Amino acid sequence: MLKKLALSTLVLTSALFASNEVNVYSHRHYDTDKQLFKMFEEKTGIKVNVVKAKASALIKRIESEGKKSPADVLITVDAAGLYAAKSKDLLQSINSNYLTTNISENLRDKDNQWFALTKRSRVVVHKIGSDVQNQLKTYEDLADPKFKGQIMVRSSNNEYNQSLLAAVIAHHGEEYALTWAKGVVANMAKEPKGNDRYQVKAVANGIGSIAIANTYYIGKMVDNKDKSQRDAVSKMKILFPKFENGGTHINVSGAGVAKYSPNKENAIKFIEFLASKDAQKLFAVGNYEYPVLKGVESSKLVSSWGEFKDDTISINTLGENNKAAVKIFDKAGWK
Ligand code: FE
């Protein structure tokens, strides 16, 4: 009831003060965002209203709200979420010179229905001095029986894993992807549970030797109030695997404008702001993500992890192969 009330208030407010706010449906769950939204509010006087939930729930909500949806901007933490929103005809093309000039083609939808705001890489994290660094070079290696009982990775309902498997499909086809997923399952140290940081902590504490995690979580563990996270990550090192015929797996967090956005101008301003130099710097320094704007550097900590070459497949493929990836995870018994 309360939820319903809040929503109708939102609709009403957006109708009355159309030019003074932007309604953001966001799957991002990082503190930096609060700071960014505040910066935008101070700069433009446009109030940012945020609804936070998983992309799948936000997409369902926009669908059921239909033409009356108050959503202006959809932000996801994964390319497949944006792809799904576009496929369901929930987004619209964004007419912005700034965005098309500054965000490279591989990091946006071909009809400009969404733009990446940050890049993140899904990598291997191992103990400093561990033999893993000599034994593992590629994502394909993760399925090698020599790593039996060594891998800590979260569950298959997580979009970061789904996109990684989507990339495996893009490189090798579905048949190989199933063999690969079965191989990784056979190599798991434990049944999947917890988030990316949980996997890193487990390996730091001697459970398995390979944790699979997104890069920025390592930064967030270093820069953490919780001593147990700092202690765990101080023992660890990042290894950037690559695909046999490609580079290191890249995913994006990005934004699109909702099809029935009541504050379209504000929505575009908001996304342009998130792609501006100041905002990109904060994504880099505050959340340890890779900026998408040319000329903005990664944080010192992130740079210290080393360089890698982005995978060669198109980011859109992650969305195209998502359904197949989910099915394959199921068949492989990846919990
Ligand atoms: Fe995340």
Per-range role (PLM):
Residues 149-156, 273-297:
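Periplasmic-binding protein-like
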Residues 167, 172-241:
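Ligand-binding pocket segment of bilobal, Venus flytrap-like solute-binding proteins
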Residues 123-130, 242, 250-263, 282-283:
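A bilobed periplasmic-binding-protein/Venus flytrap-type ligand-binding module shared by bacterial periplasmic
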Residues 25-28, 92-100, 110, 113-115, 126-128, 140, 148-172, 227-249, ...:
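Short beta-strand->loop
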Residues 177, 288-335:
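An extracytoplasmic/periplasmic, membrane-proximal ligand-sensing/linker region
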Residues 69-74, 92-124, 140, 150-153:
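A structural signal for short loop-to-beta-strand junctions that line the ligand-binding cleft
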Residues 19-84, 335:
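Early extracytoplasmic/lumenal segment of secretory-pathway proteins
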